[in-house]
């Protein structure tokens, strides 16, 4: 069930130091692990917090095997409820994910024509861009949401009779036409191309990230008109003005590969993550700290900490930063974010 992680998940350094005074409090994720995996608290307490002395991230070690990790993020908590809640709040109340003034600042200071994100599609800025492209109408949002859910469900025909299949097919056509007409009627202007890069990580939500039997990535692809692509060398040809990674860089066992992919393909990368200076919650194998920004800079990944520049009230310790492999890009944006 557990395995040792004796090197840093990000930089692969073996210079990791146990932090004896750091403990993580239980949360609803942890309570679910203990219950569903039938782990006693004594065994669970063997998980200790380590810090990488090279890049500054924190790690839980030992931690779950990759097989158990996949079970956690596909079965025990297969639904990314925070992500889906962001969508539901937007549809019902036109409330955006709380990123302070980030969207307005980025749009003002970066000419964005091609934009991409990694994995969780409702954690970042896709909802903001969608709202910019269409008439700001709650009735439109609710209408298209209902028709999307009905459309996806009408295509789920396993175990149905031939008559039900025939009727469902007719309904599917109606729902699909409703979606098309609603978008066409309410569209103001398509001003950018949007991409979502996905992978099959065992440390993040994917195959079972569903709401009302609809997968988040499928829903997002239709709602936002996304180009949905896999992380692979073939897709390095795509270039972006901005790449967003929102609470997902600590949900992959290959964070450096993901970050480098984003940096190599985009002028700017914006990252939103936990800032776990005082411990690390046990649903994470690793997490970032502000020390990580110094490591990036020393490795010519230039960055600016914008945590205090986006007018956000924080309930927890979090970190926002912009980065680029082009120093001129960061120097330019740093002057604009003062």
Q: For each predicted feature, which ranges?
A:
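S-adenosyl-L-methionine-dependent methyltransferase catalytic module, highlighting the catalytic core
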Residues: 2-5, 54, 245-247, 252-338
